[in-house]
UniProtKB/Swiss-Prot annotation:
Belongs to the purine/pyrimidine phosphoribosyltransferase family. XGPT subfamily. InterPro entries: PRibTrfase_dom, PRTase-like, Xanthine_Guanine_PRibTrfase. It comes from Aliivibrio fischeri (strain ATCC 700601 / ES114) (Vibrio fischeri). Purine salvage pathway enzyme that catalyzes the transfer of the ribosyl-5-phosphate group from 5-phospho-alpha-D-ribose 1-diphosphate (PRPP) to the N9 position of the 6-oxopurines guanine and xanthine to form the corresponding ribonucleotides GMP (guanosine 5'-monophosphate) and XMP (xanthosine 5'-monophosphate), with the release of PPi. To a lesser extent, also acts on hypoxanthine. The gene is gpt. This is Xanthine-guanine phosphoribosyltransferase. GMP binds at residues 69, 92-96, 134-135.
Length: 152
């Protein structure tokens, strides 16, 4: 993927707060199920904004930094997801979302970002991303010193 969409920490907080507004009223939720690892940061923000204390994880491995690979369920929460917000950072091809729907058919599946191939699988999201675009998440980047242009 040649195109990149960079999400800063500030943007992630802003987008996730917008997502939280779509999930009101907060008292309808028993808890949040974060899809590890991409959903961990958004889950923390949702937990704060919706004042939800019960946060669990489902660990599904399908990416290795910049490419997809076989999906493995490492850890799962018991139950059908009823009353839970299931949060991931992104729905891309939809493979992870399909698995989550199978595991938690009564949960509310939400993502911060959505690509066209998987957008129909989520109940709510905030940012549309073109299919051929790679997302750089803030936890995958570091702030580094850059020489002034005049020194180059």
């Amino acid at each position: 993927m040649a195109n990149k969409f960079v999400i800063t920490w500030d943007n992630m907080q802003m987008y996730t707060r917008q997502l939280a507004e779509q999930l009101l009223p907060a008292d309808q939720w028993k808890g949040i199920l974060a899809v590890s690892r991409g959903g961990l940061v958004p889950a923390a923000i949702l937990a704060r904004e919706l004042n939800i204390r019960h946060v669990d994880t489902v660990c599904i491995s399908s990416y290795d930094h910049d490419h997809q690979r076989d999906m493995t369920v490492v850890k799962a929460m018991e139950g059908d997801g009823e009353g839970f917000i299931i949060i991931d950072d992104l729905v891309d091809s939809g493979d992870t979302a399909v698995k989550l729907r199978e595991m938690y058919p009564k949960g509310k599946l939400v993502t911060v970002c959505a690509k066209p191939a998987g957008v129909h699988l989520v109940d709510a999201y905030v940012v549309d991303i073109p299919q051929d675009t790679w997302i750089e998440q803030p936890w995958d980047m570091a702030v580094t010193y850059v020489d002034p242009i005049a020194k180059k």
